[in-house]
């Protein structure tokens, strides 16, 4: 089989190509009154966030990793007039609540922009002051204090969530919160229209039109045989079952099992990758709270049912034993954030201490601020490459959240 542009058969294989999104003007459109609606707790300082992100990208390049940017790929995907028009229509359709019937005027505003300017503006959002429109609807008088026709997308620098590379394909995700739902439109157009991906037979295991929510932070590729997916506030059991059926029926798939792991519906446990992240053949960084529950969890292993067009589901309760079994290792080592200390662990978990990016077996990228966790990783034989993130972390995501692997070497 000809090698395609997507290949991710593990969490730990040597990373060759990664998708990032450089923080942009969308962060400057965060204001205190509307933080929660855009899923932020704080406002990063854009200049410093960009400097930190640039250093993150350079750190990856220094390790021989190709870095590609979502905003650039998106602009390169809409060069054809018809594609650009459809892209704008999809964005505006998803934004009807805020554009208040002003599609025509907004399209006129967009018509003056280059492809790259258009993508950047859609990501940044449109303030009402940017387009002088006559108030004609009652809802506009009532909603006059809301500052945007097009909401900013400040979460976009977390490229892990709107899509997920699995095997030679991707899921293009229906995001749980409306604030993030438009984000997966970009990858939809990239796969269909970018020269790097179009006509390359990249399977879409789930697309954004699915009625069921799923987010990439809940999707972990444990091996060429096994996926682990969190059942969380943002990822539904229905989406996981649909994904399993779609992957299992693919004639070229190598995946045989999906381990669905229920996690609490709280912001602390936002996604599975805030609870555990694979960093070596038998090692995981974990949220220390998992130790209280690890032998009493709802874990479901989904398998194809002996060649039939159906699945079978086996329930278990012990996380460590389940992971060791599906990874075919004697045991797995859980390395707790902040060494499990009641203070250090809570602080470093808030700062995404367990959200590490593995770039090859036993080598991870982490925030330098999580020094207790980083030293513990080193004590366990893990090579730790530290990056600064005083502003990036304000979005509540770590190096794994900020990256979407497109190609890893097989292990």
UniProtKB/Swiss-Prot annotation:
One of its GO terms (cellular component) is cytoplasm. GO terms for molecular function: arginine deiminase activity. Pfam families: ADI (PF02274). Its main location: cytoplasm. Its EC number is 3.5.3.6. Keywords: Arginine metabolism, Cytoplasm, Hydrolase. One of its GO terms (biological process) is arginine catabolic process to ornithine. It is found in: Cytoplasm. Pathway: Amino-acid degradation; L-arginine degradation via ADI pathway; carbamoyl phosphate from L-arginine: step 1/2. It catalyses: L-arginine + H2O = L-citrulline + NH4(+). The active site is at residue 401. The keyword Hydrolase applies. It is an enzyme of class 3 (hydrolase). The keyword Cytoplasm applies. NCBIfam families: arcA (TIGR01078), PRK01388.1 (NF002381). HAMAP family: Arg_deiminase. This is Arginine deiminase 1. It comes from Staphylococcus epidermidis (strain ATCC 12228 / FDA PCI 1200).
């Amino acid at each position: 089989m000809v090698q395609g542009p997507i290949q991710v058969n593990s969490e730990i294989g040597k990373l060759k190509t990664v998708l990032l999104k450089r923080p942009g003007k969308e962060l400057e459109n965060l204001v205190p009154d509307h933080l929660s609606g855009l899923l932020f707790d704080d406002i990063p300082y854009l200049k410093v966030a960009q400097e930190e992100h640039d250093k993150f990208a350079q750190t990856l390049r220094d390790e021989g990793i190709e870095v590609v940017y979502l905003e650039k790929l998106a602009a390169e995907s809409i060069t054809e007039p018809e594609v650009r028009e459809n892209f704008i229509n999809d964005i505006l359709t998803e934004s009807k609540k805020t554009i208040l019937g002003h599609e025509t005027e907004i399209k006129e505003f967009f018509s003056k922009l280059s492809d790259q300017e258009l993508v950047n503006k859609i990501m940044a959002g449109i303030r009402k002051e940017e387009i002088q429109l006559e108030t004609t609807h009652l809802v506009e008088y009532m909603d006059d204090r809301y500052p945007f026709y097009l909401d900013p997308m400040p979460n976009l620098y977390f490229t892990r969530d709107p899509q997920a590379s699995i095997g030679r394909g991707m899921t293009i995700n229906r995001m749980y919160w409306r604030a993030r739902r438009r984000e997966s439109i970009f990858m939809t157009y990239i796969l269909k229209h970018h020269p790097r991906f179009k006509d390359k037979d990249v399977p879409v295991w789930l697309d954004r039109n699915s009625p069921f929510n799923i987010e990439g932070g809940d999707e972990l590729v444990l091996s060429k045989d096994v996926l682990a997916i969190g059942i969380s506030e943002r990822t539904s059991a229905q989406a996981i079952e649909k994904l399993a059926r779609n992957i299992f029926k693919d004639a070229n798939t190598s995946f045989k099992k999906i381990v669905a792991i229920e996690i609490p519906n709280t912001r602390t446990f936002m996604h599975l990758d805030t609870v555990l992240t694979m960093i070596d053949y038998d090692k995981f960084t974990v949220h220390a709270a998992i130790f209280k529950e690890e032998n009493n969890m709802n874990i479901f292993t989904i398998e194809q049912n002996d060649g039939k067009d159906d699945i079978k589901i086996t329930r278990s309760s012990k996380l460590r034993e389940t992971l060791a079994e599906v990874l075919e290792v004697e045991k797995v080592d859980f390395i707790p954030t902040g060494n499990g200390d009641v203070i250090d662990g809570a602080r470093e978990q808030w700062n995404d201490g367990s959200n590490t990016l593995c770039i090859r077996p036993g080598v991870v990228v982490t925030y330098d601020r999580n020094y207790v966790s980083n030293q513990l990783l080193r004590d366990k034989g893990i090579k730790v490459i530290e990056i600064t993130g005083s502003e990036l972390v304000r979005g509540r995501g770590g190096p794994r959240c900020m990256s979407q692997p497109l190609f890893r070497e097989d292990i």
